[in-house]
């Protein structure tokens, strides 16, 4: 006996076709912040170390087995004579400064217990201040500057950090271990670059500060991507 297809089935089929057509026109990511980006090759020449001016490099920095270890003391000198800035041992990514486009920093960071009151990652360049973003550690918690919480209980763990800067939109998004944790404005257009390591905060710094970094990478997107919505796994297109 020949069975008739119900109008309900036709409606379902039509709805499915519409859904497939809609999805084909969207960019997707697998909840990974690097999807849709192209890796920018880096060499050791791109890793410039800023350290207390009176200390030899190996007194504040080591690179062994793929791990970059950076440390500084609260009473160390600044990175150059006459600078009013706080003590630091930082990696400055050189050769890829930018003032437009969509750029991304990626790295894995380990902060030993006891390190506090220190910036471990920065997006340099802003209108009204020196930086568009600072990720600081206070008593085992990772914060944006001193307020917005990014991650808690981070001591003695490796964290994957991804920072996406959409210059045209003036927006910075921070991911920890692949999960979106923070979206902030970048305080206006400027010449930008990425930094990581240890840079003593204006106050509340521990006597000894250390961070370790590995798998540092830089990415750029040629598309006008506005970000990855991790709740749905899709790229939001400008």
Curated annotation (Swiss-Prot):
Keywords: Signal, Vacuole. Pfam families: Alginate_lyase2 (PF08787). Residues 225-238 form a propeptide. It is found in: Vacuole. One of its GO terms (cellular component) is vacuole. Residues 1-31 form the signal peptide. InterPro entries: Alginate_lyase_2 (IPR014895), ConA-like_dom_sf (IPR013320). SUPFAM superfamilies: Concanavalin A-like lectins/glucanases (SSF49899). The keyword Signal applies. The keyword Cell inner membrane does not apply. May be a subunit of a vacuolar malate and citrate transporter. This is Citrate-binding protein. The gene is CBP.
